[in-house]
A protein has these predicted regions:
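Predominantly soluble domains enriched in secretory-pathway, periplasmic, or organellar proteins
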Residues: 1-305
Length: 305
């Protein structure tokens, strides 16, 4: 059964626009959405299900990540990383990055930001580790175009999807040492998330597969076909489901790795990015709907507002 649609939250100038990776900050109850076409961050109040702010000044923003009231954005148009207070919207810092920053992660307790940069004709792809308070950086070269990244629960390692050769690259934090490459059986590693409890990574690949990997050994433990080229991928620890956004034809593929149950929920053409709001909501940013399509991620959707 498809995920239940609960409603739509309109975003100003959102119809047929271009968005990218979004993130929910539990501390403030806000969702931060990269509005790439408008060079801004859109903010949603989850409890009220309302758009509450448009934050300008994020050129070509490619993604937002959140941790305990802190937001980090990757700004492709400026080759910068922005550190933002989720409650006040105060910009705490803007840091130079490699060309075309893409995937990102933030660990507040360590004051650490991670940026995976695509590069350009003059500089190849790099992975950067940024001390947000000391304003120091470490960087390593990458073997291919980086996509999304996540960290383990202890923030001791970062996992990064590389498109070709398709792999998950693993590096120690914060110094980016002990680099390991974990090859994937499907081409075009793209979306990525992690189940900390079961120590499983979920990599959605452009060749049409969701790959499950043991996050301690790199062993591939399962592979499921998916309906198209994926983008943003989220694991919900409350439901045990993995949600893969597929922009064309416009759907979310939902897989429960432990039971094998799966479903497809039609969203809209171009809806390639989402945000998981634990425990029971999935926000699909849908240009066709002009904002956020709110879905229930629960076995009992009737109780969710």
């Amino acid at each position: 059964m498809p995920l239940k649609t609960l409603g739509v939250i309109e975003i100003p100038n959102g119809t047929d626009s271009d968005f990218d990776h979004a993130a929910f900050d539990p501390k403030t109850g806000r969702v931060f959405i990269a509005h790439t076409a408008r060079d801004c961050i859109e903010v949603i109040n989850h409890d009220a299900k309302q758009h509450i702010a448009t934050l300008p000044g994020f050129p070509g923003v490619a993604g937002a990540v959140a941790d305990e009231g802190d937001i980090l954005t990757t700004n492709r148009g400026a080759a910068t990383i922005t550190w933002l207070d989720a409650a006040t919207y105060e910009v705490k810092g803007v840091f130079p990055s490699g060309p075309l920053p893409n995937g990102a992660a933030i660990i507040k307790r360590l004051g650490l930001g991670i940026a995976a940069c695509i590069g350009d004709a003059d500089q190849g792809p790099v992975l950067q580790s940024i001390n947000l308070k000391a304003v120091t950086q470490r960087a390593i070269d990458l073997p291919g175009r980086p996509r999304w990244c996540v960290t383990d629960e202890a923030a001791e390692r970062v996992f990064l999807c590389i498109r070709e050769p398709s792999m998950v690259l693993v590096a120690r934090l914060p110094d980016l040492g002990d680099v390991v490459h974990w090859p994937l059986p499907s081409g075009g590693a793209h979306g990525l998330d992690i189940d900390h409890a079961r120590k499983r990574l979920y990599a959605a690949c452009d060749d049409g597969a969701l790959v499950e990997i043991d996050s301690t050994s790199g062993k591939v433990t399962n592979v499921w076909p998916i309906a198209g080229v994926p983008d943003v991928t989220f694991f919900n620890p409350a439901t045990g489901r993995v949600h893969v956004a597929i922009g064309e034809p416009g759907l979310v593929e939902t897989i429960h790795p432990q039971t094998g149950a799966r479903t497809r929920t039609v969203t809209g053409a171009g809806a390639h990015t989402t945000a998981i709001v634990v425990p029971d909501h999935l926000y699909v940013i849908s240009p066709r709907h002009g904002g956020v399509l709110v879905l229930a991620d629960s076995e009992d959707a009737s109780r969710i507002a």
